[in-house]
């Protein structure tokens, strides 16, 4: 793994050094798990969640961030030969992980937060876990539409995505469906900035949606998204964030579609400990499994709306409401 930099600074900052219990107690050795990711700075939700899961499950955990110039497949293969109970990769590294898995059939691998449809076919020693936001995104859309009904004027909500790809549309498609259900036919304005990194691209698109009457904006564009959220703040309208709880940004945040990566990682770590990893198969963790949820809801939302939202949530969890997802990409 020459050239790989094990993210020691990140390990210390995330508290991973204390994740594993001390040996010599007679207890079984804790499982050893390693996460291979491009950069914890760009995955600043995933890496802290990994650390929390390691502490919660008593797992010996490492993070490896390979140099982009090196052979990533070789990095995965070397980690597999080192005897880790589980080697996890982020979706961007899935092709290299699959190659290494085919070369090391005795090792166990997993890809975190990858749509199952994109991970087939897969080697028999690779598990895919999809943190599926669609049910929580539907609830966020319903809440957006319901609050829009309280605003004077025509009902309209907007959604700014990065690219028209399944991981983005898993937010936008159910958000749209929820808004339509709450408003019985609001105008839903969607668009794609064609960027995950340029806030200006999202700002331009969000301003266009506000000019078309949108009273709520969904941000589903990664690092481009702050442009959308700032437009909502300046326009005095609601915004809905994704991935993490964005309520700390200000009173314009209606709610957020929060991915609980810590619970997904904890599930994988426990399965590795108990030798029950669903290798060769995929798992979905969504609203019902606690893998996603709505973040803090604005205190300005009326109590009657919260009660209605709770009823919709029960219907979604029970399967009485069929929530659409992204079309196959």
Model segments located where?
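Bacterial N-terminal signal peptides
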Residues: 7-17
């Amino acid at each position: 793994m020459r050239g790989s930099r094990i993210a020691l600074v990140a390990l210390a900052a995330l508290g991973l050094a204390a994740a594993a219990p001390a040996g010599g107690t007679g207890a079984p050795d804790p499982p050893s798990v390693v996460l291979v990711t491009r950069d914890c700075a760009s995955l600043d939700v995933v890496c802290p969640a990994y650390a929390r899961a390691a502490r919660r499950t008593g797992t010996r955990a490492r993070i490896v961030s390979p140099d982009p110039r090196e052979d990533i497949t070789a990095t995965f293969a070397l980690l597999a030969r080192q005897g880790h109970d589980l080697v996890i990769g982020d979706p961007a590294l899935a092709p290299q992980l699959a190659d290494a898995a085919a070369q090391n059939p005795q090792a166990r691998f997993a890809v975190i937060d990858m749509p199952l449809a994109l991970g087939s076919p897969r080697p028999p020693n690779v598990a895919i876990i999809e943190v599926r936001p669609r049910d929580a995104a539907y609830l966020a859309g319903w809440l957006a539409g319901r609050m829009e009904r309280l605003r004077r004027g025509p009902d309209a909500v907007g959604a700014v995505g990065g690219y028209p790809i399944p991981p983005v549309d898993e937010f936008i498609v159910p958000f749209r469906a929820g808004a339509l259900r709450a408003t019985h036919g609001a105008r839903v304005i969607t668009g794609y900035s064609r960027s995950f990194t340029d806030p200006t691209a999202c700002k331009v698109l969000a301003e266009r949606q506000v000019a078309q009457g949108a009273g709520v904006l969904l941000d589903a564009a990664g690092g481009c998204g702050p442009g959308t959220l700032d437009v909502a703040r300046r326009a005095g309208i609601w915004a809905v964030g994704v991935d993490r709880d964005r309520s700390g940004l200000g009173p314009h945040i209606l709610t957020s579609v929060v991915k609980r990566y810590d619970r997904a990682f904890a599930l994988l770590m426990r399965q590795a400990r108990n030798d029950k990893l669903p290798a060769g198969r995929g798992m979905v963790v969504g609203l019902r499994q606690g893998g996603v949820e709505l973040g803090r809801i604005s205190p300005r939302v009326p109590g009657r709306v919260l009660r209605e939202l709770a009823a919709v949530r029960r219907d979604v969890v029970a399967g009485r409401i069929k929530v659409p997802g992204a079309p196959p990409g």
